[in-house]
Amino acid sequence: MQATSTGSNGRQRIFHVSSRENIKGLRDEVLRMHGFEVQSTLYSSQASEEVAQRDYDLVLIDVESDFRVQSAQELCDEIKKVVPEQHVAFVCNYRVAIESDCPDEIIRAEFNPEALVRGVQQALGKNEE
């Protein structure tokens, strides 16, 4: 597993990928308020390249609907090809059904900031083991 790669400010680094600008901004702000260093982008073919350019403790991929499962899976696979040891988690609502081997974690957050932070903390804790 990838070692913890805290930023120069001592905070854990998260790379967040979302398909909706407003959700991306809200989740980024919640994570920053809880002490994480966050860089984010909208879904794009360059997301895996961005992950490879810098060490991240966790990559979060938003999966807002069943429609997004395949693109999230493909992005996860791309990231793991470029950075095999990268810890990846999908952030989903409770209606999204995911059966996949790629993400290391599935965080069920709905629109609950506490569940998001708790899921990220748990995923990062498993990453350090």
Give the positions of each predicted feature.
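Acidic, metal-coordinating helix/loop segments flanking the phosphotransfer/catalytic sites
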Residues: L42-L58
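Short acidic, S/G/P-rich loop/turn micro-motifs used as interaction or catalytic elements
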Residues: R20-I23, E64-R68, R95-V96, P113
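Alpha4 helix (beta4-alpha4-beta5 surface) of REC/receiver domains from two-component response regulators
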Residues: E74, F90-A109, P113-E114, R118
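Non-catalytic signal-transmission and effector/linker regions of two-component phosphorelay proteins
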Residues: M1-K24, D28, N112-E129
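A generic structural motif
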Residues: H34-V38
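Conserved phosphotransfer cores of two-component systems
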Residues: A52-R54, E78-Q86
